[in-house]
């Protein structure tokens, strides 16, 4: 995942003023039939051409770097100027709570039948009432099996590393995933709201900081390839980028568990092109189109015929691609924390400020 997860409406609203002008000028004046906002590289580069060939409709794809960026724009404009938006599940949950997303017309999205049953039973949106999952996966440990001489099977392998690993480990910088490692190591929920338990996790992570090479959301896999790092916290698909370059890089979900992250697609309530937007969602859920994400960004997609169409060699090379939906579904979904997000943000600020 290339996204940031400081998941609060308050923060999104705080960003809104700064980006209000951008949101309206970048999208509202567009003459395309649809404006789609997504992370860069998260869809095929020829998506506009292929969608037009299939439907006769034109689209403009605009990119957001983080969930917070697009949330600020959406809050500033109340979603006007955008038709379809890709956001991570806690943000989809926030948008739905704010009344900003359109209920999905399943009759207009026949390819929704391609989703695994588990993908239609996600707790934040059972039945896919207002969102469809685009990609999903786990967060775990990515390591150099040729260099690490101790077992890697627990979050404590990272948080309390062997002496030989000190200064050779990295953790994700983003609030939710950084805190998740500490919470899971203590047997707590990744959505924990008890301030005392959040404080415990914070203290674990302050101690772990003393052993780290860096906090790193974007280059940890290249550090593994070079050997600068030997053990890192990683999203499963990003670990695959390292595995592609070095067969000694391995991925494991720690015995204490993982979060289940989901990136979703929503249609904005204030879209003036809802019928066309539903056609776009259906187009993405076509098995061939959805398989592109698995083949090219190496994340699992929750689309049964799409996954079944993949070369079996992918599952042999990349462990996450072999995970069944049932295996993924046993991990805990990241949820919107509401007012408790401020406790996470405060804890992370204190962790990063600690010596």
Role assignments for model-derived ranges:
Residues 198-207, 243-269:
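Periplasmic-binding protein-like
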Residues 222, 325-355:
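Conserved C-terminal helix/tail region of periplasmic/extracytoplasmic solute-binding proteins
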Residues 81-82, 86-211, 216-228:
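Extracytoplasmic ligand-binding site segments that recognize negatively charged/polar headgroups
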Residues 91-94, 225, 231-248:
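A ligand-binding cleft/hinge motif common to bilobed small-molecule-binding domains
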Residues 142-147, 183-187, 262-273, 292:
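A bilobed periplasmic-binding-protein/Venus flytrap-type ligand-binding module shared by bacterial periplasmic
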Residues 96-103, 125-128, 241-253, 315-319:
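Ligand-binding "clamshell"
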Residues 32-94:
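Early extracytoplasmic/lumenal segment of secretory-pathway proteins
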């Amino acid at each position: 995942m290339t996204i940031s997860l400081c998941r609060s409406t308050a923060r999104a609203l705080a960003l809104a003023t700064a980006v209000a002008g951008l949101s309206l000028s970048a999208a509202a004046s567009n003459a395309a039939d649809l404006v789609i906002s997504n992370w860069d590289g998260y869809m095929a580069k020829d998506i506009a051409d292929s969608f037009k060939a299939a439907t006769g409709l034109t689209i403009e794809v605009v990119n957001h770097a983080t969930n917070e960026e697009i949330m600020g724009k959406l809050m500033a404009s109340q979603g006007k100027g955008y038709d379809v938006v890709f956001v991570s599940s806690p943000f989809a949950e926030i948008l739905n709570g704010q009344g900003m997303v359109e209920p999905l017309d399943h009759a207009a999205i026949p390819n929704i039948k391609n989703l695994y049953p588990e993908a239609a039973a996600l707790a934040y949106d059972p039945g896919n009432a207002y969102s469809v999952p685009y990609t999903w996966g786990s967060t775990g440990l990515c390591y150099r099996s040729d260099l690490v001489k101790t077992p890697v099977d627990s979050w404590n392998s990272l948080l309390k590393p062997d002496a030989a690993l000190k200064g050779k480990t990295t953790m994700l910088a983003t609030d939710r995933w950084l805190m998740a490692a500490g919470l899971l190591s203590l047997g707590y929920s990744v959505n924990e709201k008890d301030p005392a338990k959040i404080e415990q996790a914070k203290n674990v992570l302050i101690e772990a900081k003393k052993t780290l090479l860096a906090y790193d959301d974007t280059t940890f896999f290249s550090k593994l390839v070079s050997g600068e790092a030997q053990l890192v916290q990683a999203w499963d698909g990003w670990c695959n980028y390292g595995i592609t370059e070095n067969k000694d890089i391995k991925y494991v979900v720690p015995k204490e568990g993982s979060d289940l992250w989901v990136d979703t697609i929503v249609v904005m309530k204030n879209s003036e092109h809802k019928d066309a937007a539903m056609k776009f969602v259906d187009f993405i859920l076509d098995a061939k189109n959805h398989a592109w994400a698995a083949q090219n960004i190496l994340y699992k997609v929750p689309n049964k015929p799409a996954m079944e169409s993949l070369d079996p060699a992918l599952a042999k090379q990349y462990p996450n691609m072999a995970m069944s939906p049932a295996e993924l579904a046993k991990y805990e979904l990241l949820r919107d924390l509401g007012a408790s997000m401020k406790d996470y943000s405060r804890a992370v600020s204190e962790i990063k400020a600690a010596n």
